[in-house]
Amino acid sequence: MKAQAKKIGNGVYWIGVLDWDLRTYHGYTLDGTSYNAYLIFGDDKVALIDNAYPGKTEELMARVDDAFAQEGKTGEECKVDVIIQNHVEKDHSGVLVDIHKRYPKAPIYCTEIAVKGLKRHYPNIKEAEFITVGTGDTLELGGKTLAFLDAFLLHWPDSMFTLLVEEGILFPNDAFGQHLCYSKRFDHEIPEHVLMDATKKFYGNLIVPLSKLVLKKFEEVTELGLLEKIKMIAPSHGQIWTDPMKVIGAYSEWATGKCKDKVTIVYDTMHYSTQKMAHEIAEGIMAEGYDVEMFFLHEDERSEIVKSILDSKAIAIGAPTINDEPYPSIGDLMYYLKGLRFERTGIKRKAVTFGSMGGKGGTPASLGKDLGEYGFDVVDTCEVYYVPDEEENKACFKLGQKLVEEAKKI
């Protein structure tokens, strides 16, 4: 296979893998992704940062070979001296065994926790030389210096960031990434709204519960005097940021709960009664000047819903009752929300719940109880018998208005 490496800096190449066909990953939908890996040429050593998903060896190695060719290297000069493993997860370590077979003398630099994880994932690599590093440690490549920074739980316990000091390129692995698959590598080469939408979706589905750690890491990086040194951010998925403050600013807003005057409405329905309620609630919300994003769980999926919730001041969740319990599809979303812990963004988003019943009912109360435990401030609930009548439609409209009144207090 022939594949081209992309030069992104002085002696620095993107040598990643494009997964054009991936449609589901980490529990949400996407239109492909990239597994970004990088090759850095120093005067004395060549370093490889991260790799790709299992089965992607051929494409990654083809780009490695092309990078050596672009640097004018031939024969025995074409070798990797150092392997940097910022993160254990398989989409960034799945080619590690094949890389080590090709370059058996190259030590693997990673965190202490990563050593344990890599040996569990890849028993055949136990004999490799592992060198553990953390904040304050550096590695000289000859005219180029790699500085390491612990990134515990951003987003796994083993995670770390690597900074190429002279070029000001930060390699933060999953942080600041997006699940996008484009032939272009840089942020400014694709539509901005596409880039930021994908970044928002990535944060909402992966980083939200770590928001407090994000802010602490920004403080640490600032105190270490590293923030002003960052000229480029090269994440492990998606586009490379040539304007690093754009994504750092976005992360800061999301981590501190900065939201729009917007309500996310999510519902499912059997015979369209709950749907009618959702639409009436939406009218009440819009009458108060707030925007609405509406999601029908029969058609829409949870990762898009979570992306919307990230910058919404309030949510409205509705479902009918079946077998004395909430409609099953809503349970999937609720368990997902439980794990994301939106309250860690520093605000309690307002919420209402609603639904129809034909017997015992109780779904709105049940959903409200759960949302309260998940860090939402539940304002009110609404339940109707079978089909909402004219007065109940008016009540739903007023419920939307009430939700906005409470959201304005945030």
Swiss-Prot record:
Fe cation 1 binds at H87, E89, H155, D174. Its EC number is 1.5.3.22. The gene is fprA. This is Coenzyme F420H(2) oxidase. It catalyses: 2 reduced coenzyme F420-(gamma-L-Glu)(n) + O2 = 2 oxidized coenzyme F420-(gamma-L-Glu)(n) + 2 H2O + 2 H(+). It comes from Methanobrevibacter arboriphilus. FMN binds at residues 269-274, 321-324, 356-361. InterPro entries: Flavodoxin/NO_synth, Flavoprotein-like_sf, Metallo-B-lactamas, ODP_dom, RibonucZ/Hydroxyglut_hydro, Rubredoxin-O_OxRdtase. Optimum pH is near 7.5. 30% of maximal activity at pH 6.5 and 8.5.
